[in-house]
A protein has these predicted regions:
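Fe-S-dependent hydro-lyases/dehydratases of central metabolism
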Residues: 1-438
Length: 438
């Protein structure tokens, strides 16, 4: 038997049949979490064709993209189109018998936070959803990837997808993370090295002592942002940290079934002699806290660094990209990154809106005040995270520092509600993307 990577094992175990000689397979999908933004047309397609949802119990509908995050979360959406999406989403949940986490549900939150809180993500699963950051679930030893609306319709009707197998990339991260560095700095380092398209067509597996040392929530940040390098999957072999983290979650097996699951999950790893199509090595020894400065996640540098000079870039396409970024951001080449003036600060999103993230923010903010010219907003990743942050006294620290303490939702990351910037604003954000308009 040939040696296999963990990614290859997961795909193989979920393959119903091979479709051709070009790597296309019919893939069984274990779970899907759908939001109000990308799924409406999929349900319309089901109705038009007279189809039903094959396994409603494997889906969760969750409102997170367009809902307001201010105190009155049950009021009408600020955008009429958003309100229409929410109304239709509620109708879809009722008509097709799928569980819905509505805006006032105590379990509601950003889908990639809610999913693991509710125990919907288990090692060895294959999960597809209408959001590119479904790669987050790789932190649990699952394969997660985003799909388009037409694929959502197919998945709802058949519980399967036509899937093209990916190449594999091994990213080895060694050494101990320096002070003030986190999983976010690791993935920004990777982006700076390989670029925003460096992992296109690949599934990444993260390995190494630095990965093992990360918390499960840190690993989620890492896998979440792998898609920013073009990866359609990111995975980390599950270990005791993962098993302890998911134990007791609402949908997890219990008793003897839990013990049986542990035996299976503990076998989920790449073979020692498995061959990857590409390898990348990162040593954390010299890593510094990093920040993106431009209009692509790979336009990044150490906080002690400078905005680059486009004329020093030999690649003409990259040089043009740098010039566009400087113009859009209103920056000057050579200026210190730490001197870039901001008007807003945003903490939240499926990348950095979990309780560990908020604890880290509170440590920095305690006893300090936000600058008078900066508007600060903190949006917890879920209602459960919000409640826990308040119980731990974190919310009081945020408010005392001058930040607005909001309810859960995607908020400024996608900006499909009132949480938006105005032309000329510049925001320091804990999200995953810095594209123009986001």
């Amino acid at each position: 038997m040939s040696s296999k990577t963990l990614y290859e094992k997961l795909v193989e175990s979920h393959t119903i049949r091979e479709l051709d000689n070009e790597g296309h397979v019919l893939l069984y999908i274990d779970r899907s979490i759908l939001n109000e933004y990308t799924s409406p047309q999929a349900f319309s397609g089901l109705r038009e064709r007279g189809r039903t949802v094959r396994h409603p119990d494997t889906f969760l509908l969750n409102i997170d993209h367009v809902n307001p995050t201010r105190s009155q979360r049950d009021v009408l959406m600020t955008d009429p189109g958003g309100q229409l999406q929410v109304d239709y989403f509620r109708e879809n949940a009722a008509d097709f018998g799928i569980t819905l986490f509505d805006v006032l549900d105590p379990r509601q939150g950003i889908e990639h936070v809610v999913a693991h809180e509710q125990g919907l993500v288990m090692p060895g699963m294959v999960i597809a959803a209408g959001d590119s950051h479904t790669t987050t679930y790789g932190a649990f030893g699952a394969l997660g990837f985003g799909i388009g609306t037409s694929e959502i319709e197919h998945l709802l009707a058949t519980q399967t997808l036509v899937y093209r197998k990916l190449k594999t990339m091994r990213v080895s991260v060694q050494g101990e993370l320096p002070f003030a560095c986190s999983a976010k700095d690791i993935v920004l380092e990777l982006l700076e090295r390989i670029g925003a398209d460096g992992a296109t067509g690949y599934a990444i597996e993260f390995v190494g002592e630095a990965i093992s040392a990360l918390s499960v929530e840190g690993r989620m940040t890492l896998c979440n942002m792998a898609v920013e390098a073009g990866a359609r999957g990111a995975i980390i072999a599950p270990d005791k940290k993962v098993f302890d983290y998911i134990y007791g979650k609402p949908q997890m097996p219990v008793g003897e079934l839990w013990q049986q699951a542990l035996l299976e999950w503990s076998q989920l790893s790449s073979d020692a002699d498995a061959v990857f199509d590409k390898t990348v090595a990162i040593n954390c020894h010299d890593l510094e806290p990093k920040v993106t400065w431009g209009i692509s996640p790979d336009q990044t540098g150490s906080i002690t660094g400078r905005v680059p000079f486009p004329e020093q870039e030999t690649n003409p396409l990259k040089r043009l990209a740098l010039e566009k970024a400087l113009h859009y951001m209103g920056l000057t080449a050579g200026m210190l990154l730490k001197d870039i003036r901001i008007s807003h600060a945003f903490i939240g999103s499926c990348t950095n809106g979990r309780i560990e993230d908020l604890r880290a923010v509170a440590k920095v903010l305690e006893g300090r005040k936000i600058a008078s010219h900066v508007r600060g907003i903190i949006v917890p990743g879920s209602t459960m995270v919000r409640r826990q942050a308040e119980e731990e006294g974190l919310a009081k620290i945020f408010i005392a520092a001058g930040f607005e303490w909001r309810h859960s939702g995607c908020s400024m990351c996608l900006a499909m509600n009132e949480d938006v910037l105005s032309p000329g604003d510049r925001c320091a954000s804990g999200t995953n993307r810095n594209f123009p308009g986001r």
